[in-house]
Amino acid sequence: MFQDNPLLAQLKQQIQENLPKKEGSIKATDKGFGFLEVDSKTSFFIPPAYMKKCIHGDKVVAIIRTENEREVAEPQELIEQSLTRFIGRVKMFKGKLNVVPDHPQLKKLSLKAKLKKGLKPDNFAEGDWVVAHLVRHPLKGDNTFFVEISEKITDADDKIAPWWVTLAQNDLPNSEPAGIENWELKDDADLERIEMTHVPFVTIDGESTKDMDDALYAKKTESGDFELTIAIADPTAYITPEDEMDKVARERGYTIYLPGRNIPMLPRDLADNLCSLIEGEIRPAICCTVTVSKDGVIGDDIKFFAANIKSHARLAYDHVSDWLENGNSDAWQPSEEIATIVRDLYEFSLARAEWREKNAVVFPDRPDYRFELSEDNDVIAIHADMRRSANRLVEESMITANICAGRTLREKFETGVFNTHAGLKPEKIEEVVQLVNPEGTLEFTAESIATLEGFAALRRWLAVQETSYLDNRIRKFQAYSEVGNQPLPHYAMGLDIYATWTSPIRKYGDMINHRMLKAVILDKEPVQKPDDQVGEELALHRKHHKIAERNVSDWLYARTLADEPSKQTCFTGEIFDINRAGARVRLLENGAAAFIPGALILDNKERIECNGDNGTISIDKEVVYKLGDTLEIVLADVNQENRSLVAKPTQVFADQPAPQTEQTVSEE
């Protein structure tokens, strides 16, 4: 009788229109119900029946009404769906195809699915990894959720899954770009390449490196200064801005480095062969010569030129470090000529490092964590590699080269691809002064730390403090590093200018700078200048690559450390973040990140306080842990599905002593 009654429908609509509405995000729970989060302090309960219309993370408009004496939200209108393209796993439900999203909050969802036209059902089995797209949503007028599978990533039990799934998740390629049959040299007709094959350049890289893009030569003068020459591989000799390969390089932005494998920005035949500075092979290069004083000051005689060079020795970091640090290396014995060059390069690097320590900012030494994998993609070991003397030698050479490029591009064109950093966020400067200089006895003022020199002085001061607590606090108040086409300073390095050009095989921004440096050499207008979008594009690529690297690492850590909770293995954790729920620590033995919930420190909310603003954890108002502290921990849980680690301290905090009464005192 009441079905399809227009008057009833109109009445219902009027009632709904008069009810208050709120906009917010959906937060799902494991129990079927959820919440509409309007802001950090306001949320409304969503009963299970209404939750069936939405997904965790959806942005919606909901009607707020009272049911059973409780305010509840009924989602009505979809503003933005949280799930569009996503990664999931195949689940067969009563013989029908479903997909379960690979997301911690969505793993209880099983969404009905179909295959995109052209995909074969026989290729899909329970647990297989797929790319799917949400094509129907109840808040869009559809009856139910429905997804379309657009591609299969890999089989359920494939050990390569961490890499392929993560790359698909971030919409990144999983292979190198296709090469071409014949690469041709496309130099400007006026570009003269100086014949420098007789100069004994050396390359220093990892033992397995194939894309060697920098070669070095140094000569110490009678006065004790250093004449440094840096030669960099020249892929822009083969790729012009109009080439299809240039578009591919720009779309990729960088070579992707993941644990155990990389995906090159350029085809391997170019990156690992034609442009790689292989020992004994003649290669086109862009070179820079500069004099660096014995005090580490970069001279004004910076000169860029094109050349044909030949590497005279392909050296490895560890062998060179052993030789420099111990006087010999079991694996490598240099000729007298190469020994002199390496020694001069090393002395140059010490002079530059000392200058930077006094006048700029030197980042603290932290290990690089490296996964050693078997052919079957199992983790054999996790190595903590410290940066040694040969690594620092190359690093100082590259920093010097990039300062030279920055100065040259600023002077000649007032543009280029610059790495910049703005120091502290302006709104946080007063807070930083209060933190480091509460009594006003130190040199740091709001005016001084807003300048490059003052910020660098602050970072140098923080580096020599007894603990890293203040350093960790202040890092949160810093701006992010950026890439842009304006010649702005790099506060975090303490440098007034910085433009990278030393990795053109691996970075698209370096290819642009190569073209601009060639314009300097030719005294012409550049064939390519960086547009206003390129910096944002590169920053976005870098962000996705870092997320991918972290996700693969988390997956491998969860695999590798799965048995540690039962073994109760002790690790050393360094606290790098504190929020109201607990602390995040880095395991110094292997680089894994783990979360310590407050309840696993002390299961008493009245007594424990985790304060994210101050970066402290207190028990009974007394600070027991703070940012930068190291503590002994054991793993309490390794969640393979979510790829997350939960840890707890080995230190046990006692129950609160019973309050003493007059009677107990007199008895004593």
Curated annotation (Swiss-Prot):
Its EC number is 3.1.13.1. GO terms for biological process: mRNA catabolic process. GO terms for molecular function: exoribonuclease II activity; RNA binding. The keyword RNA-binding applies. It is found in: Cytoplasm. Keywords: Cytoplasm, Exonuclease, Hydrolase, Nuclease, RNA-binding. Residues 568-650 form the S1 motif domain. Gene3D superfamilies: 2.40.50.640, Nucleic acid-binding proteins. It catalyses: Exonucleolytic cleavage in the 3'- to 5'-direction to yield nucleoside 5'-phosphates. Residues 193-521 form the RNB domain. Pfam families: OB_RNB, RNB, S1. GO terms for cellular component: cytosol. PROSITE patterns: RIBONUCLEASE_II, S1. InterPro entries: CSD, NA-bd_OB-fold, RNase_B_OB_dom, RNase_II, RNase_II/R, RNase_II/R_CS, RNase_II/RNase_R, RNR_Ribonuclease. Involved in mRNA degradation. Hydrolyzes single-stranded polyribonucleotides processively in the 3' to 5' direction. NCBIfam families: 3_prime_RNase (TIGR00358), PRK05054.1 (NF003455), RNase_B (TIGR02062). Belongs to the RNR ribonuclease family. RNase II subfamily. This is Exoribonuclease 2. The lineage of its organism: Bacteria, Pseudomonadati, Pseudomonadota, Gammaproteobacteria, Vibrionales.
